Amino acid sequence: MLSIILVMSLVFLAAVGCSSAGSEDTGTASGTNGDKDKPKKIKIDMMIASWKGGGWPDNNHPIIKYIDDKFNVDLQIQWVPNANFYEKLNVIAASGKLPDVMRIDSPSQYLKWVEEGVFQDLKPQLAQYPHLQSIAKPEEWALLNPKDQIFGIPIYATAQNTIYVRKDWLDKLGIPVPTPDTFTIDQFYDMAKAFTTQDPDGNGKNDTFGFSALGNASLLGMPELFAPFGLANGWKEENGKLIPMQVQSDEWKAFLTFMSRAYKEGVLDKDFVTNTNFNEKYAQGKVGFADMHYQFSQQTNQQLQTIAPGAKFVELAPPMGKDGMRGTPTPTSGTIKVVLSKDVDAEKRDRILQLFDWWVSPEGEDILKNGIENIHYKKNSSGAYEMTDELKAEGEGRQSLLWNWVLRNNSNTFNTYKWSDPTWAKEMEQSIDNAGKYPYKNASDAYLFSSNTYLEKGTALDESFHKTVIEIIAGKKPVESIDEAIKEWKSSGGDQIIEEVNAAYTANP
């Protein structure tokens, strides 16, 4: 279901293998008695979506060569821009020959192809690969799969964004930094209003505000404000039934009363309806609260120094409602999968699973995240690690494309490297841990894409619903008009979506 909260998930991914024995040192396909015992070289075709910067220019990259040598394979990666990935994949599928390995980010595409029988069932072999098996919980392996079958390796996902506040503004206004035990939604509003009305930047102008957002269907910008009012993150479970946020009349009215007041009083950015990028306003020193991840907070703090020396965003727990309800929108591990084509024979399948098992092991993580010593990083004269000139020229993070864009394990150190500043790395990991302390999950993640009505009508229904939400916040409609939007959503297909989602939930709770 289209969640009103767009969790950016930034993120995150990788795939790996080790020997079926699962030891750290034996993740190799080579025999122990010379070349005569060495298994034949196997070609592995992998098709992966690429993001900003694209994939590596060819398959001669040092990490691919390392994998080829270690596992006696010929790894051929086809990088496809994310915007065109499924168009190209469907063309290839129509030809009857899928790549050996793919990453499927679309749950609906995954379910469709599972039903058509185009993927390998990995469950019979999984217990032989302990590193691989350990990257997800049993329910995450089972997600979106038929009972007693596993057609995809689940991608680990975790919350990364949290609420941040301008501490220097708090200090100037004499407001203490709120603690997790005391930070309420009312306190959030009072602080945000002070940022709007008390000239926290001291420039004598009425040009600051409490928080911002995007006036699109997701209302992206401050997702931690939904949970205090009891709104679901898409769907919630109640009394054995899944309920979508679109039918939560009382909760919507409480939330919209809060938001429309914030808009009227200038606490919410007046430009939120037309915003396309509120991040710029953080760096311009106009916003008191922000929703972002640690890495971006540090970049923003650096940018702020040019206009406000000493300015600093610091992390907070999400605010809680009157009943103690609070939450950080949390993605569900397993909705994205790495899959093997059904046409992969047993020998190639086992080699791929050996590779993946090593990939998510500590040894594999070291290579796939940090790169290769003396190529991507080296020790300096003081014994500390630093990037090589080659990696600096290529760009930090380019060495870890397989780790971030294919598959990774469930460690929260995926954005730190051997050469990262130790304090920065520790704070980064702690921030991700903090984001996971207040899980706020979508209860329908395993079932929503089983609804044909949702697949056909869900996006249009939600866009119409959220148009009313935005109009109410902006003062163009009264809060009570949300009931008409709920009625329209239900009668135009929402009731059928609820029925279909709950049928799937009842069949496989």
Question: Where are the regions a protein language model picked out?
Answer:
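Short helices/loops that flank or line small-molecule/ion binding pockets
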Residues: 86-98, 189-195, 277-287
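Helix-loop-helix "hinge/cap" segment bordering the ligand-binding cleft or interdomain interface
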Residues: 147-218, 235-281, 340-351, 357-358, ...
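Extracytoplasmic/periplasmic substrate-binding proteins
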Residues: 50-57, 171-179, 215-268, 296-332
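Bacterial N-terminal signal peptides
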Residues: 4-14
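Glycine-rich, aromatic-lined ligand/substrate-binding cores of catalytic
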Residues: 261-264, 279-312, 318-400
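Conserved small-residue motifs centered on glycine
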Residues: 354-471, 476
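Loop/turn elements at helix/coil->beta-strand transitions in domains of secreted/extracellular proteins
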Residues: 40-44, 71-75, 96-100, 146-151, ...
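Conserved N-terminal structural module of periplasmic/extracytoplasmic solute-binding proteins
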Residues: 12, 18-185, 233-235, 239, ...
